C-alpha cells in the first residue's frame, strides 16, 4: 500500500488504491458476518450484498486516508511513513464513531495472539497503540529508501530493540498479574454454554425445558459459593417479566450461595431491551443492565420506518427492534464488582 501510493500519480488514483486495499482487507476478515443471515430464508438473498457491500463501504475510509496522504506529495523518507501512519490511524479513529461507529478490525488487532506486546495498551490506549503498530509495520519500507546501508540497518535495529523491550515489559506484567490469579476469591464462576440447536430458538420451545437443561448443566453445589453465567438470549421466546413463572425451578435447585447471570430480553411499554440480569436463588432481580450499543440490522433495523415497508426486519428473532439504553454502571453484588458488556459492545470498550 505504501509503495503503490508513493508511486501513484493523481489523487483519485491514490484514493482508488486505498479503497481497494481496504476492500480486500475487510472482506478477508468480515466474511463471517454472513453466517447470521443463514437462519431465516428471508435473509439469505442478502448474503452476497453483505459480503461485498460492507467491506466496499469500509474500504472508503482507507481510500480517504491515502487520498489525504497524496496532498503531501510523499517522498521515500521517514516523514512519509509518519504521515501515512497518522492518516490511517486518524481515519480508523473516525471510523470508531461516525455513522454510529464500527471500531472493529483495527490494524493493531494483528497483535491479538501476542499478549506480551499488548500490555502497553494500558498506558497508550487502543488508538495510540494502533498508530505505533502502523509505524512499526511500515518500517521495513526503509529498505527501499535512498539511505545509506548503515542508516537502514540502524533504523531496523532500533525498531527491533523497541519491539524486544516491549515484549520483555509485557512478560513482566503478565508474570506479576499471575499473582492475582492465585488469590483465593472464595467463589467459583461457572460459564454454562449448552450446545442447543438453533432451531430450538425458532420453534417456540417451552422455556421450562430450556431452564431445566441449564440447571442440569450447571450442576449446582449447595455448599459452594458460585456465580453461574447463562448465555445471552438463551430464553428467546419469553421476557424478563415472564421469568417469575419459573422461579420455583430456581428455588428448588439453587441455594443462598448462588447467583445467576442471565442474558434475556426485557420490555418497558413499547420498548424492548437486550438485558443482562443478576438473579438470586429465587430468580429475584438483584441488578439489571440494558445493552447500550446495538448491532445494526442484527438487533435493530436502521431507517426502520422506511425499510420495514419492504418486508425487512432485524436479523434476530422478532420484528420489533431493540432499544438502546445510555447507562452503564458498575454492578456490585456482595463486593463482587464488574462492568457489564454484552457481545458486540466489547469492540467499543
Language-model segment annotations:
Residues 1-177:
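Membrane-embedded alpha-helical bundles of multi-pass enzymes
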Residues 173-349:
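Soluble catalytic domains of enzymes that build or remodel membrane lipids, polysaccharides, and related
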Amino acid at each position: 500500500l505504501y509503495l503503490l501510493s508513493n508511486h501513484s500519480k493523481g489523487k483519485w488514483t491514490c484514493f482508488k488504491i486505498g479503497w481497494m486495499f481496504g476492500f480486500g482487507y475487510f472482506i478477508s476478515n468480515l466474511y463471517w458476518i454472513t453466517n447470521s443471515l443463514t437462519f431465516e430464508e428471508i435473509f439469505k438473498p442478502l448474503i452476497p450484498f453483505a459480503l461485498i457491500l460492507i467491506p466496499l463501504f469500509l474500504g472508503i475510509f482507507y481510500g480517504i486516508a491515502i487520498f489525504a496522504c497524496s496532498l503531501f506529495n510523499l517522498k521515500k523518507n521517514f516523514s512519509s511513513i509518519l504521515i501515512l501512519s497518522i492518516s490511517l490511524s486518524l481515519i480508523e479513529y473516525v471510523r470508531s464513531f461516525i455513522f454510529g461507529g464500527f471500531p472493529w478490525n483495527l490494524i493493531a488487532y494483528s497483535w491479538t495472539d501476542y499478549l506480551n506486546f499488548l500490555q502497553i495498551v494500558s498506558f497508550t490506549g487502543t488508538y495510540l497503540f494502533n498508530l505505533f503498530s502502523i509505524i512499526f509495520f511500515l518500517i521495513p519500507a526503509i529498505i527501499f529508501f535512498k539511505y545509506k546501508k548503515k542508516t537502514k540497518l540502524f533504523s531496523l535495529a532500533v525498531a527491533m530493540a523497541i519491539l524486544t523491550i516491549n515484549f520483555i515489559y509485557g512478560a513482566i506484567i503478565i508474570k506479576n498479574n499471575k499473582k492475582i490469579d492465585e488469590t483465593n476469591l472464595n467463589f467459583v464462576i461457572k460459564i454454562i454454554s449448552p450446545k442447543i440447536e438453533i432451531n430450538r430458538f425458532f420453534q417456540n420451545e417451552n422455556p421450562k425445558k430450556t431452564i431445566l437443561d441449564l440447571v442440569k448443566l450447571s450442576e449446582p453445589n449447595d455448599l459452594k459459593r458460585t456465580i453461574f453465567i447463562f448465555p445471552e438470549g438463551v430464553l428467546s421466546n419469553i421476557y424478563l417479566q415472564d421469568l417469575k413463572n419459573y422461579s420455583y425451578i430456581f428455588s428448588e435447585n439453587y441455594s443462598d450461595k448462588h447467583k445467576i447471570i442471565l442474558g434475556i430480553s426485557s420490555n418497558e411499554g413499547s420498548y424492548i431491551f437486550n438485558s443482562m440480569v443478576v438473579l438470586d436463588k429465587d430468580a429475584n432481580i438483584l441488578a439489571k443492565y440494558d445493552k447500550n450499543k446495538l448491532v445494526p440490522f442484527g438487533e435493530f433495523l436502521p431507517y426502520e420506518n422506511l425499510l420495514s415497508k419492504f418486508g425487512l426486519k432485524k436479523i434476530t428473532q422478532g420484528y420489533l427492534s431493540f432499544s438502546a439504553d445510555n447507562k452503564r454502571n458498575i454492578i456490585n453484588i456482595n463486593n463482587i464488582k464488574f462492568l457489564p458488556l454484552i457481545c458486540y459492545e466489547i469492540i467499543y470498550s
